[in-house]
């Protein structure tokens, strides 16, 4: 009986010693789930970057993502409506998300972003916050009433600014 109790105790200790390793794996990455990426189509796209298919984007996997293209295509099951989770991709330099049904987009944490292409959405809010590296911005055919681009270091007038 004493041996059996000691055996159970050892098994419990060994099992508990494995728990911190499992917890740290999610602490050093982002789980690909409905909480972090609520939009199913965006979550599906994000899963393509999970090279080891463990359901978690590691810090290394995240830092290797420079470009995301998720343009709408109704023939492939609909449009993206929410890009919540885009803030995790801090090395992102190019985001293409045109022809969807996105109404709010916050890329203020994507400070490496140099190119943002999101025409033909339903954008009413676009937060460019700290995007001083942004060089190309396309937001035509949206519902934006105003757009603060004061964070940009250089802006050039569009051709329509010269129209008679």
Spans of features found by a protein language model:
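Sec-dependent N-terminal signal peptides of Gram-positive bacterial secreted proteins and lipoproteins
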Residues: 4-22
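N-terminal capping/linker segments that flank leucine-rich repeat
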Residues: 16, 21-94, 111, 132
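Conserved hydrophobic position(s) of the canonical leucine-rich repeat
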Residues: 65, 92, 102, 113, ...
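Concave beta-strand-loop units of leucine-rich repeat
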Residues: 69-76, 97-101, 118-122, 139-143
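Single conserved hydrophobic/aromatic residue that forms the stacking wall/gate
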Residues: 154-164
């Amino acid at each position: 009986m004493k041996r059996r109790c000691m055996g159970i105790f050892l098994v419990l200790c060994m099992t508990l010693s494995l728990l911190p390793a499992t917890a740290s794996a999610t602490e050093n990455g982002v789980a690909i789930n409905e909480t972090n990426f609520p939009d199913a189509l965006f979550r599906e796209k994000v899963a393509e970057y999970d090279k080891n298919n463990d359901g978690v984007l590691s810090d290394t996997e995240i830092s290797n993502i420079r470009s995301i293209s998720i343009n709408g295509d109704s023939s492939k099951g609909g449009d993206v409506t929410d890009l919540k989770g885009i803030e995790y991709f801090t090395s992102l330099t190019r985001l293409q998300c045109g022809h969807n049904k996105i109404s709010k987009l916050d890329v203020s944490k994507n400070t490496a972003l140099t190119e943002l292409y999101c025409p033909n959405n339903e954008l009413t809010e676009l937060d460019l916050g700290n995007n001083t590296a942004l060089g190309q911005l396309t937001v035509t055919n949206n519902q934006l009433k105003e757009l603060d681009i004061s964070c940009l270091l250089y802006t050039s007038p569009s051709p329509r600014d010269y129209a008679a």
